[in-house]
Structures are given as structure tokens and as C-alpha cells.
Amino acid sequence: MNIFRLLLATLLVSLCFLTAYSHLAEEKPKDDRSLRSNSSVNLLDFPSVSIVALNKKSKKISRKEAEKKRSSKKKASMKNVARPRPPPPNPCVATRNSCKSPAPACCDPCASCQCRFFRSACTCRVLSPSC
């Protein structure tokens, strides 16, 4: 029985080596002529690339356009910040204070009452910082 297992083990190992060897790539030595012919064919397959230098005017125009885009973004962000907020209600709860259901609303218009642990712990929290 031990001889039979030894024979099966050697057969299995030899099959593993045979499959690994069959999957290896074979490299054949190539002469210079075949390399030259392959390289010329490869160069002809690809389209040629032309490099064009930019003049100073085109660089200035692109910089001006970039500055205009930056300034328009700044103006848009300033418009969002400058909008008026509604006044807080008179009896209100400050941010990060308890705001259970009988308590009044949060003072910050961007804050809302968030409850955890089955509505046992409720606090006023600001959800979005961009508000």
C-alpha cells in the first residue's frame, strides 16, 4: 500500500511539473534582420504625431479664461454665503443641547434635532456645513 501511494505521489508531482512547463513561454533567439523588419512594420502601423508650439498670445488667453472662471466661481460662492437666514424662534435650543419632543426647535436654522437610543438622547446638530 505504501508503494502504491508513493507511485501516485510521484505521478501527481510529475503531472504538476509537466503542466507548469507547458505553460512557460519559450524565447527563441532572434537575429538582427528579423528585429529590423518587425520594428519597421510596427512604426508604420501607428499614425505620426505632430508637436505644435503655443505662441505667447494663446498662453495669455488661456490664463485670462482661467482667471475668469476662478472669479466666477468665487462670485457664485459669495452669493451662496450672502443669503439671509431666517431669524430663530424665541424659545429655542442651542446647538449640541438636548431637544426632546416637548422642547422648542433648534436656534440654528441649519441644525435639526437628532435622536439616538430609541429617542432617549436627542441633540441639536448641524447636518450640512455648507448651509
Swiss-Prot record:
Q: Which SUPFAM superfamilies match?
A: Agouti-related protein (SSF57055)
Can you give the residue ranges of the Agouti domain? Answer: 92-131
User: In the record, which residues are listed under signal peptide?
Assistant: 1-20
Q: Name one GO cellular component term.
A: extracellular space
Q: What is this protein called?
A: Agouti-signaling protein
Cell location: Secreted
Molecular function via GO: melanocortin receptor binding; neuropeptide hormone activity
* A GO BP entry: melanosome organization
Please quote what the entry notes about the protein's domains: The presence of a 'disulfide through disulfide knot' structurally defines this protein as a knottin.
| Organism listed in the record | Vulpes vulpes
* Annotated function: Involved in the regulation of melanogenesis. The binding of ASP to MC1R precludes alpha-MSH initiated signaling and thus blocks production of cAMP, leading to a down-regulation of eumelanogenesis (brown/black pigment) and thus increasing synthesis of pheomelanin (yellow/red pigment).
Q: Does the keyword Disulfide bond apply?
A: yes
